[in-house]
Design a protein with these regions (language model features):
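Noncatalytic, beta-rich nucleic-acid-contacting surfaces in large DNA/RNA-processing enzymes
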Residues: 1-276
Length: 276
């Protein structure tokens, strides 16, 4: 077992970002728990916490330089946000505001959020956006930004996707949905099987466009658990009735051609099945 977890950690370290999400899902399927980024637990590479648990590395966060990571590793653990922001041994020109912002939005500072904060957005605004220079300023910020509350699920998803380059599939496709897809043999869109015709994906962006004749159509950018981005053209749509939700999983039966790629025709609620 020890050898296995060592191998998994090495595998996750070596896989390129384009295949990282697939590698993480593979590790989960083999019974390993993947813990999120954490200023007190994450290292430079995938860290083994126990025989079944690994934690993501700080190096996956865009905007986190080596010098900022050095400061964290040298002076942790941090039990409170005060210990993190006002540590006389930390060189804050290295662990600067940009690094704090990236750490916080990537969820790596979640353990430092206590009941003084109404949510993660309140915490982020009071500690990173308006970075307090003194302890007194932190108290003032906590009161000042109290109404901020929490980030939305969509904001959290976008932060992780943009800051780490890895789309957090598990935040959108839970284990129950994944089990059903596996049970019925529905592949992700990047593994589309023309004979089966069915696939699933997560919508990241929808753009309205018009043909040369002025007919409206959508271009949906989608992703799946292989971290492959794909475009789907949706023809004959009605903008008043046809809504495709961002960051939600869908099952669909698209057409595929070498010229046009993937496309669907007609009413969205008939061509696209919202999962969950």
């Amino acid at each position: 077992n020890y050898y296995n977890v060592e191998w998994v950690a090495s595998f996750l370290d070596k896989e390129p970002e384009t295949r990282k999400e697939k590698a993480i899902n593979l590790a989960k399927q083999h019974g390993y728990t993947i813990q999120p980024l954490n200023v007190n637990k994450s290292h430079r590479s995938w860290e083994i916490l126990d025989e079944q648990t690994l934690v993501a590395p700080l190096t996956t966060i865009k905007g986190m330089g080596d010098k900022a990571i050095d400061q964290i590793l040298a002076h942790r653990p941090f039990n409170t946000i005060e210990e993190f922001l006002f540590n006389e041994n930390i060189i804050y020109s290295k662990l600067n505001k940009k690094a704090l912002d990236a750490l916080c939005r990537a969820g790596a500072m979640a353990d430092l959020i206590d009941d003084r904060f109404t949510g993660d957005k309140h915490f982020w605004t009071a500690t990173c956006v308006d970075r307090p220079r003194k302890l007194k300023n932190l108290g003032e910020n906590i009161e000042k930004y109290r109404p901020e509350g929490n980030f939305s699920d969509d904001e959290r998803i976008d932060f992780l996707a943009n800051l780490t380059g890895i789309f957090p599939i598990s935040m959108v496709v839970d284990s129950a949905i994944q089990r059903k897809l596996d049970q019925y043999g529905i592949p992700p869109i990047s593994e589309f099987d023309a004979e089966l015709g069915m696939c699933w994906c997560i919508v990241r962006e929808v753009t309205k466009k018009r043909t040369k004749n002025g007919k409206l159509f959508y271009v949906a950018k989608v992703i799946d658990n292989n971290s492959v981005e794909t475009q789907i053209r949706c023809w004959s749509v009605n903008p008043d009735k046809d809504i495709i939700y961002i960051n939600r999983p869908y099952m669909l039966k698209p057409k595929y051609s070498l010229d046009w790629g993937f496309s669907t025709y007609g009413r969205v609620d008939q061509a696209w099945v919202l999962l969950g």
